């Protein structure tokens, strides 16, 4: 009997290979070309286009073990993880699929054969459900599989009818259920298959996609019905191994053992501890796989879900007594258990570990402070007899301390409290509105309906500017002016010109559009920019500098060659830099944006931390070494599928056509790219990285220059060095040493100044003490002093308080057109007088506000001329 999780996984795939299925590897957790999904959450996701008839995969039967995440979005199990035996954020789904090949009879027969003969589950424990109107499936189960009629249950559309959407492919489904026995679940005598307890476990769902539903709800039979099945590996392992929880299987045993060693909390001894142990075990798998598939923690989208999962695990670690980062230490355990099935994890082990550690450290910085505030709020609510954490508190924890809302809800759950979700959303909307008001960007321009109209009329442009072509002849097919079609453009008029064929590159993929001229008989049009509003349309934007251009005119198109060559050099350099970065820093580097101009290049990429200077130097040196090798830059046009098999780097989420250009630079770089490039790497000349920065969570940017601009940059830097060296009267090569000495001298002098200030303050404080007056038995000292900043004023006040021993002090100073006030109350008087209350009453005298503790408070205001009046006000208060 097969029991081990790894054996079940392999036996399933091998079984269906024996039934003529192609074994298909798991797809990424990031759904390809499907913006409707946050994560891959089922085995059928990667086959969606095959089911819709939009893709021919070359096989009609498939079997897979798909990694899935259900957290965030429509399918969200996050808040239940840890509290139940079955919920997971990450799990593996076994599935077999038919694209217009076999149907119900085979799907049912093979499912039954696998469970009863391969896994050897007892037949008497298995139940099935069918859609209430699916007589065909009912007969197959009853007559061919010989399942007793009392163990075949007909259910309605809600339970047993699957739909891809409101319209489109749909069909009935049949679920195979395992009865764990009377000793499991609610224990009620009337317990049945639809009871919410744990007795009856759904193991396998067989979906028979046989209809097309229209907007009126009418079902039309599909010409080629499909099969889509799904079975959770973790759940099947629990049944096969005879345990009551997925977490008790061998799939989780190594992780739980490792967590128990780290925390000193054995699994199975204390239910509260067990919840946290299960949370950490599940989340350790999720974060490893999500990061491995290229997702980084951030405050939006998939990155935010990852952050929520990771921080929830960190918080449960704290409940188990872990006050230091620990989750990253579980990465090797996850990878060791999964490396045979997902070998790419092994290559990314170091990277995944670093990302997790970095995020743990960030959260640890704010976790304690946030927990303290939340605990104070919980105590306050309990005293008040209320049970809901206000939305503004939830928002503050989210905005200031990085607590996702579900983490806050999870924490207060133990105190039987809930959070005000609506109040939180209102606070979020206020913040969004402020952001909208302060945003000055123009946003993405909508594609003009005019371009769409031209396209439907059959007007298109073929780009002929690859392979260094900068000249071509063509014919004007359309002229536009102020978003209107015109028949001609006259001298001095601005507009857009469209031709049948052009060597001008229209801005797309980060490469800017070309400039140049378009010339006809007694007509010259200056091209100031070239755009690509549609895939098949290129627009030349500019003005007529001579004559008149008309629709139908024959023209000669001349690209500004120097600018094009410089742009090409920067584009090719971007490819080299990406390849160099992958070599130096790891294959997790993925392009998330770029800009290529004639002057410079900008490359945005996924990475979790600042690139150190030595790493930048390695990247630059490696790229320049490839330039010196003068490798040929070869471009091939291939079908997309064939191109992807070559291992060429592709931009994630980029929409590619059926055929793509593959740009190869020797053995160093290979990318899918539709832009223009130089002929050999030596044409780039030289790359110089000039800046590296963070532009968003998990996204960084490199800026660089090449060729002549790189030389100009080096020359500017050299001139600045010479200028600084001349001022300091040293050689440029000794400049660093000289600056270090100057900084040390400055620090020494600053220390000396502080020492002198302290001595003067001590002397002044001794002199001022004689001015203290006794009012109602309390020594009160008020004085205007010479303090250039708040720190000096505080230092001076501390010395006065130490010497006064008992009393109230109010001192003030004028600096940079403002008044500063400091109030101090010695500890023996803080039960009668509060420095904070005193300063709040006096601050308005100088036009300001203030506050602080009972023993010390400060204020500032824009009316220094009222300082003396403010100081006298203290005596009146006492």
Curated annotation (Swiss-Prot):
GO biological process, alphabetically ordered: alanyl-tRNA aminoacylation; negative regulation of DNA-templated transcription
Cofactor(s) annotated in UniProt: Zn(2+)
Catalytic activity: tRNA(Ala) + L-alanine + ATP = L-alanyl-tRNA(Ala) + AMP + diphosphate
Residues involved in Zn(2+) binding: 571, 575, 673, 677
PROSITE patterns: AA_TRNA_LIGASE_II_ALA
EC numbers, comma separated: 6.1.1.7
Keywords, ordered alphabetically: Aminoacyl-tRNA synthetase, ATP-binding, Cytoplasm, Ligase, Metal-binding, Nucleotide-binding, Protein biosynthesis, RNA-binding, tRNA-binding, Zinc
CDD domains cross-referenced by the UniProt entry: AlaRS_core
Record flagged with keyword rRNA processing: no
SUPFAM superfamilies membership: Class II aaRS and biotin synthetases (SSF55681), Putative anticodon-binding domain of alanyl-tRNA synthetase (AlaRS) (SSF101353), ThrRS/AlaRS common domain (SSF55186), Translation proteins (SSF50447)
Signal peptide range in chain numbering: none
GO molecular function per UniProt: alanine-tRNA ligase activity; aminoacyl-tRNA deacylase activity; ATP binding; tRNA binding; zinc ion binding
One GO cellular component, as annotated: cytosol
Location relative to the cell: Cytoplasm
Cofactor binding comment, as recorded: Binds 1 zinc ion per subunit.
Xref: SMART domains: tRNA_SAD
Free-text domain note: Consists of three domains; the N-terminal catalytic domain, the editing domain and the C-terminal C-Ala domain. The editing domain removes incorrectly charged amino acids, while the C-Ala domain, along with tRNA(Ala), serves as a bridge to cooperatively bring together the editing and aminoacylation centers thus stimulating deacylation of misacylated tRNAs.
Described function: Catalyzes the attachment of alanine to tRNA(Ala) in a two-step reaction: alanine is first activated by ATP to form Ala-AMP and then transferred to the acceptor end of tRNA(Ala). Also edits incorrectly charged Ser-tRNA(Ala) and Gly-tRNA(Ala) via its editing domain.
Family: Belongs to the class-II aminoacyl-tRNA synthetase family.
NCBIfam families in UniProt: alaS (TIGR00344)
Record-given protein name: Alanine--tRNA ligase
Native species: Syntrophus aciditrophicus (strain SB)
Protein's gene: alaS
């Amino acid at each position: 009997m097969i029991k081990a999780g790894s054996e079940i996984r392999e036996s399933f795939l091998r079984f269906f290979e024996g039934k003529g299925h192609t074994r298909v590897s798991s797809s990424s957790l990031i759904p390809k070309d499907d913006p409707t999904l946050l994560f891959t959450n089922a085995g059928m996701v990667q086959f969606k286009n095959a089911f819709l008839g939009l893709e021919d995969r070359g096989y009609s039967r498939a079997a897979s073990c798909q990694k899935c995440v259900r957290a965030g979005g429509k399918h969200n199990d996050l808040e239940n993880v840890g509290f139940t035996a079955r919920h997971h954020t990450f799990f593996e789904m076994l599935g077999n699929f038919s694209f217009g090949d076999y149907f119900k009879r085979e799907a049912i027969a093979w499912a039954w054969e696998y469970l009863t003969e391969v896994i050897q589950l007892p037949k008497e424990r298995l139940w099935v459900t069918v859609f209430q109107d699916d007589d065909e499936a009912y007969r197959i189960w009853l007559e061919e599989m010989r399942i007793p009629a009392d163990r075949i249950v007909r259910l309605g559309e809600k339970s047993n009818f699957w739909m891809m959407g409101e319209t489109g492919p749909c069909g009935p489904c049949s679920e195979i259920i395992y009865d764990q026995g009377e000793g499991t679940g609610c224990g009620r005598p009337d317990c049945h298959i639809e009871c919410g307890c744990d007795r009856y476990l759904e193991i396998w769902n067989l979906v028979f996609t046989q209809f097309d539903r229209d907007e009126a709800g009418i079902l039309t039979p599909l010409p080629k019905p499909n099969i889509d099945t799904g079975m959770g590996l973790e759940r099947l392992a629990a049944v096969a191994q005879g345990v009551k929880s997925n977490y008790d299987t061998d799939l989780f045993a190594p992780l739980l053992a490792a967590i128990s060693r780290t925390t000193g909390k054995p699994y199975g001894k204390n239910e509260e501890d067990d919840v946290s142990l299960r949370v950490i075990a599940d989340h350790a798998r999720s974060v490893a796989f999500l990061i491995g598939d290229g997702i980084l923690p951030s405050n939006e989208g998939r990155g935010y879900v990852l952050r929520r999962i990771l921080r929830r695990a960190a918080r449960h670690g704290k409940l188990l007594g872990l006050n230091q980062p620990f989750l990253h230490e579980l990465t090797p355990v996850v990878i060791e258990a999964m490396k045979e099935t997902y070998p790419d994890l092994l290559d990314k082990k170091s990277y995944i570990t670093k990302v997790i550690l970095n995020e743990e450290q960030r959260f640890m910085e704010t976790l304690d402070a946030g927990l303290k505030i939340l605990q104070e709020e919980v105590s306050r609510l309990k005293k008040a007899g209320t049970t809901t954490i206000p939305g503004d508190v939830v928002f503050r924890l989210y905005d200031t301390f990085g607590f996702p809302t579900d983490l806050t809800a999870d924490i207060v759950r133990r105190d039987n409290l809930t959070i005000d979700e609506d109040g939180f959303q209102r606070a979020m909307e206020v913040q969004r509105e402020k952001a909208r008001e302060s945003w000055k960007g123009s946003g993405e321009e909508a594609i003009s309906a005019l371009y769409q109209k031209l396209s439907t009329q059959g007007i298109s442009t073929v780009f002929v500017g690859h392979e260094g072509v900068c000249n071509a002849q063509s014919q004007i097919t359309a002229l536009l002016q102020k978003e209107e079609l015109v028949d001609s453009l006259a001298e001095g008029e601005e507009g857009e010109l469209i031709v049948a064929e052009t060597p001008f590159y229209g801005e797309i993929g980060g490469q800017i559009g070309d400039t140049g001229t378009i010339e006809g008989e007694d007509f010259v049009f200056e091209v100031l920019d070239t755009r690509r509003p549609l895939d098949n349309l290129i627009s030349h934007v500019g003005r007529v500098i001579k004559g008149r251009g008309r629709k139908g005119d024959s023209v000669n198109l001349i690209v500004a060659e120097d600018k094009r060559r410089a742009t090409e050099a920067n584009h090719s350099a971007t490819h080299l830099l990406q390849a160099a970065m992958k070599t130096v820093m790891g294959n997790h580097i993925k392009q998330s944006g770029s800009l290529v101009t004639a002057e410079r290049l900008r490359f945005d990429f996924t990475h979790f931390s600042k690139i150190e200077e030595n790493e930048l130097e390695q990247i630059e040196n490696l790229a320049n070494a490839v330039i010196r090798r003068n490798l040929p830059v070869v471009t091939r046009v291939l079908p997309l599928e064939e191109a992807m098999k070559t291992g060429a780097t592709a931009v994630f989420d980029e929409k590619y056509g059926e055929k793509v250009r593959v740009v190869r630079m020797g053995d160093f770089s290979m990318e899918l790219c539709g832009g223009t490039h130089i002929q050999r790497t030596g044409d780039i000349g030289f790359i110089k990285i000039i800046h590296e920065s963070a532009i968003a969570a998990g996204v960084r940017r490199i800026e660089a220059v090449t060729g002549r601009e790189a030389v100009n940059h080096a020359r500017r830097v050299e001139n600045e060095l010479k200028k600084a060296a001349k001022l300091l009267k040293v050689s440029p090569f000794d400049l660093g040493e000289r600056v270090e000495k100057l900084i040390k001298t400055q620090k020494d002098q600053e220390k000396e100044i502080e020492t002198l200030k302290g001595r003067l303050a001590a002397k002044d404080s001794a002199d001022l003490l004689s001015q203290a007056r006794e009012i109602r038995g309390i020594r009160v000292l008020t004085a205007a002093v010479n303090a250039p900043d708040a720190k000096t004023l505080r230092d001076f006040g501390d010395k006065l308080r130490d010497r006064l021993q008992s009393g109230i002090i109010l001192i003030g100073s004028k600096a940079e057109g403002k008044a500063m006030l400091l109030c101090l109350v010695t500890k023996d008087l803080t039960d009668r007088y509060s420095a904070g209350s005193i300063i709040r009453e006096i601050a308005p005298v100088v036009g300001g506000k203030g506050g602080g503790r009972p023993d010390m408070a400060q204020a500032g205001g824009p009316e220094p001329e009222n300082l003396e009046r403010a100081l006298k006000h203290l005596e009146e208060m006492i």
